[in-house]
Amino acid sequence: DPGRSRRKTPGCNGPIAVKDAQAAVTDAENLKAAMAAHGATRGFMSAASPGVVSLFFKNHHYPSHEAYLHAIGEAMRAEYETVAKAGFVLQIDCPDLAMGRHIQYRESSLADFRKGAALHIEVLNHATRNIPPEQLRMHLC
């Protein structure tokens, strides 16, 4: 998509921090209420991976992609843990690990793409370290 490079998109121009931890709690409470109203007993909530956030919000603050990715992962950890604490399965959407190959990294060698993907997975694993594996699933597209 050649037009994509000319779009003005939001980006990171300062330290990343959670501004409203209550928002994720409220979302989980709303989903629980909706499930109860319809007799559902199991549910999941989805959240973006740190890697995909880094693709859509350009870094203008951190000294490297790695530092930026780690800051995103730490901020997303709060949301991930809120979802798990509420009893839901957390579905992490990770297009950066699949679709990113032919879109964002099409000019990169396969080895470079794999190196980047390994970093994204490392950050994701760190961000989800307090969540039981049975409460996690990954969506690739």
Predicted regions and their residues:
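Domain-level signal for soluble alpha/beta catalytic cores
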Residues: 1-141
